[in-house]
Amino acid sequence: NVNYLVSDYLAEITMSIMARARARDEKLGYATDFIQDLIVPNLSEINRKGIKIISNAGGVNPLACAEIVENLIAEAGLNLKVATILGDDLITQIEELSDQNYEEMYSNERFPEKDNILSVNAYLGAFPIASALQDGSDIIITGRSVDSAVTLGACIYEFGWSPEDVDQLAGGSLAGHILECGTQATGGNFTDWQDSIDNLVDIGYPVAEV
């Protein structure tokens, strides 16, 4: 039985692509394939089996993404609770951030000119996801969360971990990173793959036990 279905859609380049989409249309800026490929074809099954959905598909516009999901739920006559986790979008603080003269930690490159910035985002963690689950949410959509947070948030809620349970949180984080890497964790990043398998078409996905 599936209890949680989690998905990670974001990378730094993805955020810039989504920011450009939002600049063209204020209703865009999220992962549209989350709607088309996950929600639309599976909504009735998600409802029937009580599967919790956790995703950072909100990108730079999680409210717009959540609105689409809520409309689909209403059209289907279902009673599912959607939660949106915000706080990563710092674009309104661009003036303040520019004035701080921040430097990139490795290259010492100065903070970019504000006119050249499409989006500014902080990484959200897993505890807000756990709180949303505690509140009874069925579908949780975040902006730029840590890649592993979609898995770790479910673990925190399921096992009742606290911020002091650092060993357990480390294990949940590791599981989350392995799972979100998908086939990269099962040989997709292996330089000499041709010496061990015939091709990369069907190399399988990782399994993590917490």
Regions found by a protein language model. Give the residues of each.
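Short, glycine-/Ser/Thr-/acidic-enriched flexible segments
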Residues: 10-12, 146-147, 185
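Charge-patterned, long linear interaction tracts outside catalytic cores
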Residues: 130-164
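Surface-exposed loop and adjacent secondary-structure segments within mature catalytic domains
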Residues: 98-106
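Metallocofactor- and cofactor-centric catalytic cores in central/energy metabolism, strongly enriched
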Residues: 1-97, 109-123, 128, 134, ...
